[in-house]
Every structure is written in C-alpha cells, then in structure tokens.
Amino acid sequence: MSEVKVRDNESLESALKRFKRSCAKAGVLSEVRKREHYEKPSVKRKKKSEAARRRKSKVR
C-alpha cells in the first residue's frame, strides 16, 4: 500500500499528485484491473503467447 505524508507547507494537490505517482510506480491499478475477474490458466497462457508474438513481430 502506498503511503504519503503531507509535508509542512505542502498543498493537498501536490500530496495527492505524489500519492498517485507512487501508486502508478507500484503498479497498484494495473494489479487491480488484472485481478478484477478470474482468468483461467489456459487463457493466461494464450494471452501471454499472443503478446510475445506481437512483440516479436513488432521488432521485425
């Protein structure tokens, strides 16, 4: 869990901006989206191989 303490003479907006940045860096939102619905292991493998195929074709 990301934790941000508001510093002296710091506006709430800048503290919120730091909190959002720390959450994005920690990958909190992407993890939540990934775990929103159950995904069968076979579907995970299929998505992973398709992503690798796309990356490989992008390089060429």
From Swiss-Prot:
Keyword NADP tagged: no
Record-linked Gene3D superfamilies: Ribosomal protein S8
Cellular component GO terms, alphabetical: ribonucleoprotein complex; ribosome
Assigned keywords, A-Z: Ribonucleoprotein, Ribosomal protein
Xref: InterPro entries: Ribosomal_bS21, Ribosomal_bS21_CS, Ribosomal_bS21_sf
Gene Ontology molecular-function annotations: structural constituent of ribosome
Protein's UniProt keywords contain Ribosomal protein: yes
Biological processes per GO annotation: translation
Region of interest called Disordered, as start-end residue ranges on this chain: 35-60
Biased composition (Basic residues): 43-60
Family: Belongs to the bacterial ribosomal protein bS21 family.
NCBIfam families: S21p (TIGR00030)
The protein, known as: Small ribosomal subunit protein bS21
Annotated source species: Clostridium novyi (strain NT)
Annotated gene: rpsU
